[in-house]
């Protein structure tokens, strides 16, 4: 690993920790391709380049270090921000993307296959400016950067909150916090106090924010980017529809047609995954707790079952829920020989991976493992239960990430430039900005929008140029 310091003795930038800086040229070439596929993000970069609304922003970023994220990072920098970045998943980094960002002089701490100890070390590093200052904004995916400051601040007052880890992830998180508390007492509360706000990318991270706010523990305002329509209805559905199959195919080379595929959860992500499997002619079954989502699945022609029913009958299992222990040890013991098990929700605890540690693991290739049970039956676990589309492939296509990252950029501008507008709480981007992102994305698709006449706008009671739907409208 390349060890990070602010500058080496020759004055060369080296404030990064990545796999291989020599991959930078490759990463830059892929970024050039991605640029043409990210019209919304590029249009926002062009619109705000002259005014640089993020001048003075210091953004601590925790989001998958991919080629598309590299385009987001450079957009934030072009708009005036200083940025330090880490990946929000130990397997999701594209090493050539990280190298391209490091070569551009932007601090980045990420490589594919980090240990959990390194993961939390890198998350700490995004908060450490070399002039001794702190960030004033967070851009988060899954909520780990936000969690770190909140849990660390709590531990400063009551060390018992990090005394009893319940899983391997918490063991390393708690250990990293204890280390920081010993080295720099008061660091967490000082750092949290400087944060103007956080913008959150995912369903899982948004749930964390709402939970903290309901308990009165949220320390700074947050914008829920995930539930912007041009994020959740596009990234979550259409992104997963393409990247799930990409991950499974790269990992296993399995023929999907004719297989029984179980999609655990039928939210936006589950809907996209079910469409993907159906498109390749799998028999798609869905598990759901919510009767409304279950009814939607049934009306789309999917069979709605329970995991207990499906465990010994299906060939491919995909968790999409954001919940814990959706696929349990007992479910996996019941599965067929060579059943494929994977997750496309944010954390690895949707599958009870910890219970599999008692068995023999045979690594087939990176992020593909055979779990060998005592009766010699094997199941194929992808990405150790972490995000299959990023662990075994390269994540969502650039075009759909343009929409998501356009929202992230606008949310960062909104929070940073209007601090008095947002007391502590969780907010949505205005509908006008949601529609703006959609307009920008449409330009490269050859789409022609119909325009309301004055008479039509008056008749349905909406502004002629939008927004066209109420806040509670369900697209």
Swiss-Prot record:
- Which top EC class applies here? hydrolase
Q: Which SMART domains match?
A: AdoHcyase (SM00996), AdoHcyase_NAD (SM00997)
**What does this gene product do?**
May play a key role in the regulation of the intracellular concentration of adenosylhomocysteine.
Q: Name the PROSITE patterns for this protein.
A: ADOHCYASE_1 (PS00738), ADOHCYASE_2 (PS00739)
| Organism, as annotated | Geobacter sulfurreducens (strain ATCC 51573 / DSM 12127 / PCA)
State any single GO MF term.
adenosylhomocysteinase activity
Q: Which PANTHER family does this UniProt record tie to the protein?
A: ADENOSYLHOMOCYSTEINASE
Under the heading NCBIfam families, the entry gives:
ahcY (TIGR00936), PRK05476.2-3 (NF004005)
Alphabetically sorted, this entry's keywords are:
Cytoplasm, Hydrolase, NAD, One-carbon metabolism
Q: Where does NAD(+) bind?
A: 202-204, 236, 265-270, 288, 323, 344-346, 389
EC number(s)? 3.13.2.1
Task: Give the family per the record.
Answer: Belongs to the adenosylhomocysteinase family.
In its UniProt entry, what is this protein called? Adenosylhomocysteinase
Quote the HAMAP family the UniProt record gives. AdoHcyase
Per the record's keyword annotation, is Transmembrane included, yes or no?
A: no
Q: Which domain of life is it from?
A: Bacteria
Q: Name one GO biological process term.
A: L-homocysteine biosynthetic process
